[in-house]
């Protein structure tokens, strides 16, 4: 379905409810620049570096896009997805069934669920929705739950230290969204709905989240304007 949620006036903050879940794949593909390109790149990188029969967990898996890409590249991987939206997981299960993918889906709050014994943890555009006081604790839990030499792949919307640069990049990004078919009204509506719900960090703050948790190094695998993917190594 096409994302037209913000064509009408909104009266609440953004949340991953049934309406968002029903249009999520269209929403993210038109809202995150080069989403398909970056998702495929990150999946291929993981497919190359993960050991045989590696255990992978996607936190905030939404409709399982990343997990399905991995399953297509490596059918030996043991895949799990965690999300707190029943509607998202319902769509994820339907897609996994359609593609014949064996994925364990878990309905849970990612800040409270147990994480242990994984070779890779994914969090694509997920940390930005975790309240800042809980974010460092979650990344620490991810680090603790990874096996030796495990990796943490996460993608985030970012801001810059320079406020003028941030403003300019956001303007370019909103032009991009308009080119994807969103009206200026829809863009403004969503921006308002996301206020204080999506809290972005700078590139340095995101790197430090991982480094302070104990990761040895953090590489960047993709970047466009204010969107970025990181790969942290335990």
Curated annotation (Swiss-Prot):
It comes from the Bacteria. It catalyses: prephenate + S-adenosyl-L-methionine = carboxy-S-adenosyl-L-methionine + 3-phenylpyruvate + H2O. S-adenosyl-L-methionine binds at residues 35, 60-62, 83-84, 109-110, 124, 191. Its EC number is 2.1.3.-. GO terms for biological process: tRNA wobble uridine modification. The keyword S-adenosyl-L-methionine applies. InterPro entries: CmoA (IPR005271), Methyltransf_25 (IPR041698), SAM-dependent_MTases_sf (IPR029063). SUPFAM superfamilies: S-adenosyl-L-methionine-dependent methyltransferases. Keywords: S-adenosyl-L-methionine, Transferase. Pfam families: Methyltransf_25. The keyword S-adenosyl-L-methionine applies. Coiled coil: none annotated. One of its GO terms (molecular function) is carboxyl- or carbamoyltransferase activity. PANTHER family: CARBOXY-S-ADENOSYL-L-METHIONINE SYNTHASE, TRANS-ACONITATE 2-METHYLTRANSFERASE-RELATED. Belongs to the class I-like SAM-binding methyltransferase superfamily. Cx-SAM synthase family. Catalyzes the conversion of S-adenosyl-L-methionine (SAM) to carboxy-S-adenosyl-L-methionine (Cx-SAM). Homodimer. This is Carboxy-S-adenosyl-L-methionine synthase. It comes from Campylobacter concisus (strain 13826). The gene is cmoA.
